[in-house]
């Protein structure tokens, strides 16, 4: 449900964990985000760093339908990386770039509530599906010009759950009534035969998933984009850092025109 406290233009940015291993990428991301007005909300993943720590803790990473299977060891690794090293790295870069930023997780103040995620490909372990977002927590920060930097560890009835960062970003964008949610990846958009599709609708996305053109980790991104659209977000975009301000693939509802 959209919080009526603020109706200034709202942007949610999700950045993948793999990209955050690159110090140059983090510095440039922080520079761009720090200059944005109104200030955005930032959601981040953990990427390879989670898998490396998980292996160090004695558990081999595995994925089900493009989503990380999360047993107790994997959850510990995700918490340590997402709420620890990655969050600190991003917040530090933003502050150095001149912004005010605060790192929080979906557990803090019960920001993101979840239920166990069911998946047709099999059991995902402690992976959660967002059911509620306390948007007023984010508005409190945004209204004081503080960028929320959100780690996708969320709260279920029986404790913390790992949440796919794309799904978390979509749920947050929906709760904020965001004008746009931007998924920043290592590719310039949704590719079809090597070319970036400038615009896609739900029908086109479902067709591209069915024929295998959209696969792997791109599926949660487009699904999260569609969920956000269903909840009232005007548009979603998938792009890379270079295209973050205006390029990439725009995903829109059927029949809409996004300017």
Curated annotation (Swiss-Prot):
GO terms for molecular function: acetylglutamate kinase activity; ATP binding. One of its GO terms (cellular component) is cytoplasm. It is an enzyme of class 2 (transferase). It is found in: Cytoplasm. Pathway: Amino-acid biosynthesis; L-arginine biosynthesis; N(2)-acetyl-L-ornithine from L-glutamate: step 2/4. Its EC number is 2.7.2.8. Keywords: Amino-acid biosynthesis, Arginine biosynthesis, ATP-binding, Cytoplasm, Kinase, Nucleotide-binding, Transferase. CDD domains: AAK_NAGK-like. One of its GO terms (biological process) is L-arginine biosynthetic process. Substrate binds at residues 46-47, 68, 162. The record marks 14, 221 as: Transition state stabilizer. It catalyses: N-acetyl-L-glutamate + ATP = N-acetyl-L-glutamyl 5-phosphate + ADP. Its main location: cytoplasm. The keyword Aminoacyl-tRNA synthetase does not apply. InterPro entries: AceGlu_kinase-like_sf, AcgluKinase_fam, ArgB, Asp/Glu/Uridylate_kinase. Catalyzes the ATP-dependent phosphorylation of N-acetyl-L-glutamate. Belongs to the acetylglutamate kinase family. ArgB subfamily. This is Acetylglutamate kinase. It comes from Roseiflexus castenholzii (strain DSM 13941 / HLO8).
């Amino acid at each position: 449900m959209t919080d009526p406290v603020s109706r200034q233009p709202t942007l949610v940015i999700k950045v993948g964990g793999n990209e955050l291993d690159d110090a140059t990428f983090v510095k440039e991301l922080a520079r761009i985000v720090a200059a944005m007005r109104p200030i955005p909300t930032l959601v981040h993943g953990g990427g390879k760093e989670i898998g490396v720590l998980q292996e160090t803790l004695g558990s081999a990473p595995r994925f089900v339908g493009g989503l990380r299977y999360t047993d107790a060891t994997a959850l510990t690794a995700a918490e340590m990386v997402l709420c620890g090293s990655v969050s600190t790295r991003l917040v530090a870069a933003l502050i150095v770039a001149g912004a005010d930023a605060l790192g929080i997780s979906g557990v803090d103040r019960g920001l993101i509530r979840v239920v166990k995620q069911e998946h047709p490909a099999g059991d995902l372990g402690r992976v959660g599906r967002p059911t509620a977002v306390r948007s007023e927590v984010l508005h409190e920060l945004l209204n004081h010009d503080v960028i929320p930097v959100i780690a996708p560890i969320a709260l279920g009835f029986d404790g913390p759950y790992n949440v796919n960062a794309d799904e978390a970003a979509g749920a947050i964008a929906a709760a904020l009534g965001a004008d746009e949610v931007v998924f920043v990846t290592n590719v310039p958009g949704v590719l079809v035969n090597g070319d970036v599709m400038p615009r896609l609708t739900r029908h086109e996305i479902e067709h591209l998933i069915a024929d295998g053109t959209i696969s792997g980790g791109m599926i949660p991104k487009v699904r999260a984009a569609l969920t956000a659209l269903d909840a009232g977000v005007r548009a979603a975009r998938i792009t890379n850092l270079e295209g973050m301000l205006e390029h990439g693939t725009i995903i829109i509802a059927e029949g809409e025109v996004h300017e």
